Amino acid sequence: MTNRLSFEMEKDLLIKGWMSHDARWFMAVAERFGIDAANRLNQLVCRELGRVEMKRYMKTLGLSPAKDLEEFLILGKAALTLYGSGLAEYEIKTLNHQTYEMHLKRCFAYENIVRAGIKDQYECGILARIQGWIDAQGLEHELAPPLGKCMMVLGKECRYSITLHFH
């Protein structure tokens, strides 16, 4: 074979493959057990996946948990680039020494639930994954608003305020 994939092409294919698996898993659970069960399990699995992938990421790079918001945001942005490249467009705004706001301007999950025709029943799993990244660092946090229905479906901007409690 003469054509070789670049690293970015390989990463893109792996991410898209995983997201295809994720969507099909969600729909299979929804069809078999109902949308409420699919939402509950999706949030649980996304949070646990986030915890595991952040622990693995930190171990691979020899990193310790973040000591302050600046370190946390640097680590989070790097993880988003690795695990979610091209899946969302977002802005991060620091509100104070322990709180930041995440504004998702474009979200693959929203785009896919609209295509799948389940937008009115879907509950956000994206922020659950980020909560897992927080859990992996042993941090307590507050999320406002709490997870629930997709904010974009509700006609709102997808904005979450996350307050971290560093030790």
Where on the chain are the PLM-derived regions?
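N-terminal accessory segment detector
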Residues: 1-99, 108-124, 140, 145-167
